[in-house]
Design a protein with these regions (language model features):
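Non-catalytic, conserved peripheral segments adjacent to functional cores
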Residues: 1-94, 112-152
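Structured catalytic/translocation cores of nucleotide/phosphate-coupled proteins
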Residues: 92, 99-100
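Short beta-strand His + acidic residue motifs that chelate non-heme Fe in jelly-roll/DSBH
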Residues: 99, 107-113
Length: 152
């Protein structure tokens, strides 16, 4: 689920809201999502981080509006109407958007451009290095060309 966020412009630049929280600390855009950890990640040019999925954890990603990352999703939930379907799209690239990733949806990202790209993500489970809640899938499970720029 892609969620459009507020972005404001003036003569001095721009301002993007990353997340609003209610009085109980819950995300206004996803009140049932309880943030347990917030993480910053930088992707260098040419990097692909894919694919993995979580059994319990859900993610909300935010790519800085003036950066851009190619996002890939693959629905591995057998009870889902979109089971075995995949999609790819760009986050950032001048837009303020958040991406909600439910548990069971494999996700990955690639920086196929020339500059580093930054993202902040919120998760509803704290990372446990001794018992990580994730399953790794091959980066090319959807084909090597999945992560290449399509011309057109």
């Amino acid at each position: 689920q892609i969620i459009n966020l507020n972005m404001f412009y003036d003569d001095g630049g721009s301002l993007a809201e990353i997340m609003r929280f209610d009085d109980n600390g819950n995300m206004q855009i996803l009140p049932e999502f309880k943030v347990k950890q917030t993480t910053f990640s930088q992707m260098l040019p040419g990097t692909i981080k894919a694919f993995h999925l979580h059994y319990n954890q859900e993610d909300v990603w935010f790519v800085m509006p003036y950066d851009r990352l190619l996002i890939g999703l693959f629905d591995a939930r057998k009870d889902s109407p979109t089971y075995n379907q995949s999609m790819r799209f760009v986050l950032g690239s001048g837009r303020a958007q958040a991406l909600y990733i439910p548990r069971g949806v494999a996700h990955g990202l690639a920086n196929v451009w020339q500059n580093p790209a930054n993202m902040i993500y919120f998760v509803n489970q704290c990372f446990d290095a001794n018992e990580p809640d994730e399953r790794r899938l091959p980066w090319d499970i959807l084909g090597e060309d999945f992560w290449t720029i399509k011309k057109g």
